[in-house]
Structure formats: C-alpha cells, structure tokens
Regions:
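Short active-site loop/helix that positions an aromatic residue
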Residues: 75-83
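Short beta-strand-centered segments at strand-helix junctions
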Residues: 66-75
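Long, compositionally biased stretches
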Residues: 1-66, 84-139
Length: 139
C-alpha cells in the first residue's frame, strides 16, 4: 500500500507493518493507523500516521533517556498482551525551539503489542515526569 508523508514522500508499505491505535492518540482520535519509520541516525524514530501525511511524532524507547517504566500488568489489557516480551514502550519527544531543548513526554508512554500490532497511549498523572532531556546548542 502506498502512503503519502510530508517528511519522507511516498512510501510503499505492507499493512502488516501498521500499528493500530483503536482509540487513536489523544488529540488525534480519528487517526488509527500508524507506522514506525527510522530517523536518519540515533535512537529516534518517526511514528507516522498512515491516513494523514502531515501527522508524525518523533519517538524513542524510554531506556535511551535513562528511564524505565514499571507498569501493572492490567495497563496492557487494552492491547491484549499475552506475552510480556511482546510489549514495546515508546515515548514521544518534542523539540522546544524557544528553549532549544528536547522534551520527552514521559507522562504519556505509548504501549505497543508487537505481536498483534495494537497500541495505545497511557496517560500517567505524575508531574515529576516532566523534564528537559538536554540543552541543544547551536554550532
């Protein structure tokens, strides 16, 4: 299937690589299908909406940021997780242009069942998880 993206142009992808968010992502509820695309280099990836070429999020594994989640098993119930090894956790990362910093959204991890490709965003009420990842200096 061909999908259009504003960052990567037209891509030919099989539907077996799609990640299904049955409830969408908060703020983007109408978009249910996404695909993970590699970034040029480093630990980051793009979570690209299949049905809207302009919607894509920078994501990475939280362990890259030195953070690990300890989640009760029932938090994975919405994605029908049978095997703990099938759980992948990603966090969205945004670039704050004003402060030249990267901000991981640790209060909203994305939980993905790698076996059935279902995912959802878990919202955690924990203000202490708000943090700046690093200052980015101009060369």
């Amino acid at each position: 299937m061909q999908i259009e993206t504003s960052r990567f142009g037209t891509l030919e992808l099989g539907e077996d690589v799609f990640i299904h968010f049955p409830w969408g992502i908060p703020g983007f509820g109408a978009l249910k299908r996404y695909v993970l695309l590699e970034h040029r280099s480093g630990p980051f990836q793009w979570l690209q909406a299949v049905d809207d070429p302009t919607v894509a999020f920078v994501v990475c594994a939280p362990h890259v940021l030195g953070y690990r989640y300890s989640l009760p098993s029932e938090k994975a119930d919405p994605i029908e997780l049978d095997q703990p090894d099938d759980l992948a956790v990603l966090v969205m990362v945004c670039f704050d242009r004003e402060n030249k910093s990267l901000r991981p959204h640790l209060r909203g991890p994305l939980l993905l069942n790698a076996s059935n490709r279902k995912a959802y965003q878990l919202v955690i009420d924990a203000p202490e998880l708000d943090q700046v990842l690093e200052k980015v200096e101009k060369p």
